[in-house]
Amino acid sequence: MRTYIRSMMRLFTIVPLLALSLIATVPIARGDQPPPYRSMLYRPMIEAARQAQTAALAAANPRATNSRSLTLVGSLALPGFNADVWAHKGFAYVGTWGAGPDACPATGVRIIDLDEPNDPTLVGAVAAIPDSTQEDVEVTRVNTRFFHGDLLVTGIQSCSDVGPQGIDIWDVTDPRHPQHLGFWDSIGAFGVHELDLFQRGNRVFVAAATPFAEFAIGEGDFRLVEVTDPRNPVQVGEWGLSDIGVEPNCDDFAQFCTFDHSVTVNENGKMAILSYWDFGAVFLDISDPAHPTFVGRTVYPTGADGDTHSVALARGDNLLLTADEDFSPGEILNPPPDDTWGFLRIWNVKNPAAPVEIGRFSTANSLSTRSDGFYSIHNPVVRGNTAYLSWYTDGVRVVDISRPRAPREIASFVPPGVEDPFGFFPPVPIVWGVVVERDLILLSDMNAGLYVLKQKQAE
């Protein structure tokens, strides 16, 4: 039996927002709602937004586009609070963020046709469920005796005491006419923050991060949900820190804080890597889905702030890139250079029981304490020896990792600052996600929407 932890965090006040009209809604059964752990997850960004709002208003000039070796092909304006981006078979999928009952547009996952990259077109949306966010989304082709086609899953988190929580599942084989298939109710913490959809043999799974579930209901933050039959999803495994004798802890983000923020599964579908914030990246053997087993973890140097937000594997799963998301440079532990905005770490994980850090990459702004934007890394994506890094106000950075001990930036794009239609965020670039689709690089900006880029060919 897991230990129940009932420590509560003080709440933050959020600027009231206008409601957005919904494109597609599906009624979802509500479960018993836990305390507002969402405030624990988003308070650092909320506080950074307040500081950036003040600093940006004091700036003399608006921000302009800044590009190196990347060409802007097209863009699509989307209402504010855009979240992650995914791409599949010529379509982009953009999720929706939210931070509380008065800051929850719930516009769902927007579906965008990229047939003409210079003129991307919104063709619909799914999972626009009231009182919830739909931040992380993945689409993949699956083939089982229950379903054959393109499957979309998105993590659902509650914005209020009536919001749903779990995984919403859709058939997007025809993206212009999506069909709802099923819903898995996590009934704990506030839902699924990030996820990874994968097929292994004749079974299909979603690896899901449910932050603070171990605090709220005593079940593991990591869940493994089988969606082989997407109309009847079922949890088959779970894991939490108490499985290795570690008590989960989070003291108002001021000290060592442990929760599963994200999860990535390796190529063969037998290893899950959990982004466990200050506890580092945790490797779990999921060969037996019902019994995830701890293998090892990355360990931060003494004095490091931590904040493992998300990860990406490279080099045949022998390298791990970890994104340390830090919104409070110099405020929590030590002044720079020890405590900066968040940056990239590169690890040798040939032996996942004992990862070794071998390289780092930062932008000039992320090494500063400037407060007129958000200069932390967010999400990494890897293709071959190239890493594509979404970096909030520093846009997207394209980094050569062929020499992982000395990563080198080869391209970048910082979009212009755009007004947040709700007045919540400052008018600065806030690039949430990046994904590569054929020869296109897609970015999602929280205020602006979708950007479509191409990398310039060397002359």
Language-model regions: role of each:
Residues 1-9:
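N-terminal secretory signal peptides that target proteins for export/translocation
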Residues 12-24:
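Bacterial N-terminal signal peptides
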